[in-house]
């Protein structure tokens, strides 16, 4: 064995001494000179052997415990995996909480020249439709926000629809009842017009009856007058016939008496002429002589009559006259006769006037009934027109109320739409503020 320092082939004395000492100790141990060391070495060997056995047992026990711990760990890990899979199936949001845009917004840098901010990518949901709206893959953030706003608007629309259903039902019932109200008003107007027409027909019938009565009365009067005239003509013809039969017997007697009467008339005429001629002269002389006497007598008579009238009065004059009772009775007879004639004339006039008044009353009632019938028909027609106009006015009133309610609903919808739009804008503003705060927190 050579030295590593000098490189010579001579042996090292120190190493040779150590080797010699070691060999000597080994020889002493074999020969029994150093018994203490041998005893100690035997005890140490036994202790080492016992410790080695204990170490082997402990190692085997530890390996068994490790296996049991490994199996229990495997079971617990399997239970945790099944529990995690159940939670992921029951709630997508909990399973994908670590994959949201906020979690992916901030990531560590992948290289020296790469920033630590990446655009977020939203997870793909399991369902492809939400309330009938199809979700597409690869949609951007703004598109998804618009979709969210659309879904919010649809939800608000459903709530508005639920709140407006009662109002719409009331409006529909009002619209349906408007024609019924109009028809009821028309029926009422038609009934009133029918009643007016019935009254008009009654008046018309009354007028026709009065006209017929007037015609019958006039015809009866004409018939009675014609009948009286016919009876008078018959009596006149009967008297003529009787007179003709009597004249046939007295014709000869009349002829003989006529000739004798002519002769007597001629004789008496001649005699009267002579007598008149003789008496004419005497009458003239007598008239001239008695003229003065008559004038004086007349004056005296007038004076006496005036005195008697002044003294006795009308009754005295009547009583002083001769035959005054005959004159009075004659005057009373004249008064009675003339009064009877006047009364008869007045009765005839009154009867005629009453008959004429009855006829005129019948005639006027007939004319009035006819005119009332015509007027009633016109009134019924106008009542129908008035009922139709009133029905149309009521229908228009109902429809105006409906239009007012619909306008109110439109105003409410507009207000709620503006509120929803403002809410969506506020949501976008909050999202933008959140992104700004996240970016500022990243770079600061």
UniProtKB/Swiss-Prot annotation:
Residues 1-13, 25-42, 113-124 have a biased composition (Polar residues). It holds the Pfam family SseC. Transmembrane segments: none annotated. Residues 15-24, 88-103 have a biased composition (Low complexity). Signal peptide: none annotated. InterPro entries: BipB-like_C (IPR006972). Residues 1-124 are annotated as: Disordered. Residues 77-86 have a biased composition (Basic and acidic residues). It comes from the Bacteria. Belongs to the chlamydial CPn_0808/CT_579/TC_0868 family. This is Protein CPn_0808/CP_1063/CPj0808/CpB0837.
């Amino acid at each position: 064995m050579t030295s590593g320092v000098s490189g010579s082939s001579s042996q090292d004395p120190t190493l040779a001494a150590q080797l010699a000492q070691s060999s000597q100790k080994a020889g002493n141990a074999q020969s029994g000179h150093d018994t203490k060391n041998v005893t100690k070495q035997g005890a140490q060997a036994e202790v080492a052997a016992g410790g080695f056995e204990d170490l082997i047992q402990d190692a085997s026990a530890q390996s068994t415990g490790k296996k049991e711990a490994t199996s229990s760990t495997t079971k617990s890990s399997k239970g945790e995996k099944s529990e995690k899979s159940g939670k992921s199936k029951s709630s997508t949001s909990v399973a994908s909480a670590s994959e949201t845009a906020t979690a992916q917004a901030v990531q560590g840098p992948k290289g020296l020249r790469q920033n630590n901010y990446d655009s977020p990518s939203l997870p793909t949901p399991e369902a492809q439709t939400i309330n009938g709206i199809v979700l597409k893959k690869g949609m951007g953030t703004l598109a998804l926000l618009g979709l969210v706003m659309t879904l919010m608007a649809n939800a608000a629309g459903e709530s508005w629809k639920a709140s407006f259903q009662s109002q719409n039902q009331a409006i529909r019932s009002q619209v349906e009842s408007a024609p019924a109200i109009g028809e009821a008003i028309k029926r009422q107007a038609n009934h009133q017009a029918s009643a007016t027409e019935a009254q008009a027909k009654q008046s018309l019938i009354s007028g026709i009856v009065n006209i017929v009565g007037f015609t019958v009365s006039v015809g009866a009067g004409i018939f009675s007058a014609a009948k009286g005239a016919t009876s008078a003509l018959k009596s006149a013809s009967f008297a003529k016939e009787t007179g003709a039969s009597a004249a046939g017997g007295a014709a000869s007697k009349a002829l003989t008496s006529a000739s004798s009467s002519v002769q007597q008339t001629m004789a008496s005429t001649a005699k009267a002429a002579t007598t008149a001629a003789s008496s004419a002269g005497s009458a003239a002389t007598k008239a001239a002589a008695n003229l003065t006497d008559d004038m004086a007598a007349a004056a005296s008579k007038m004076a006496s009559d005036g005195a008697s009238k002044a003294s006795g009065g009308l009754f005295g004059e009547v009583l002083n006259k001769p035959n005054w009772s005959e004159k009075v009775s004659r005057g009373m007879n004249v008064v009675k006769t003339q009064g009877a004639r006047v009364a008869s004339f007045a009765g005839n006039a009154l009867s005629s006037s009453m008959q004429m008044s009855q006829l005129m009353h019948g005639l006027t009632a007939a004319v009035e009934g006819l005119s009332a019938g015509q007027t009633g028909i016109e009134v019924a027609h106008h009542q129908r027109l008035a009922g139709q106009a009133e029905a149309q006015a009521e229908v228009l009133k109902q429809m105006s109320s409906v239009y007012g309610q619909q306008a109110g609903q439109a105003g409410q919808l507009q207000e709620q739409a503006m509120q929803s739009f403002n809410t969506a804008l506020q949501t976008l503003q909050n999202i933008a503020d959140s992104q700004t705060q996240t970016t500022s927190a990243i770079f600061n």
